[in-house]
């Protein structure tokens, strides 16, 4: 059985976790929504390439959240501003994960430790977007 066939029977959130093995968090979320986005895998990988270790590799906004917001725009954009929807997705992700910045989620410069693993951030980003779709 080919990998894509195997993954197609899995819940989207678990597909994203599987994609995380070989890709960054943003790419993993985008690939999980690939069938609905109707874009070549190479394009999705390119779109998410600069979001590893948080936005711009600076441990800022979590790449998984960025991927979910890119997917949200691709799925729902209708030539109107999407600020309310983007805000809802951010809030839903933060509720599930405890923060939105990569360095906060990973416990960098904090005594709290890891709030949410990368795998769980990817899983929760997919769940949050599915909830809002």
Per-region residue spans from a language model:
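Buried hydrophobic packing segments
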Residues: 29-33, 65-75, 125, 129
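Domain-length accessory/inserted modules outside core catalytic folds
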Residues: 6, 18-20, 39, 44, ...
């Amino acid at each position: 059985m080919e990998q894509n066939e195997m993954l197609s029977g899995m819940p989207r959130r678990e597909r994203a976790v599987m994609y995380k093995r070989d890709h960054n968090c943003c790419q993993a979320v985008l690939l999980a929504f690939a069938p609905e986005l109707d874009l070549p895998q190479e394009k999705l990988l390119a779109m998410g390439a600069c979001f590893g270790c948080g936005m711009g590799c600076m441990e800022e906004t979590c790449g998984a959240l960025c991927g979910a917001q890119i997917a949200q725009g691709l799925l729902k954009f209708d030539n109107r501003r999407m600020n309310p929807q983007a805000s809802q997705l951010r809030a839903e992700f933060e509720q599930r994960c405890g923060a939105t910045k990569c360095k906060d989620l990973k416990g960098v410069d904090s005594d709290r430790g890891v709030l949410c693993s990368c795998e769980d951030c990817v899983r929760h980003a997919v769940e949050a977007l599915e909830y809002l779709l």
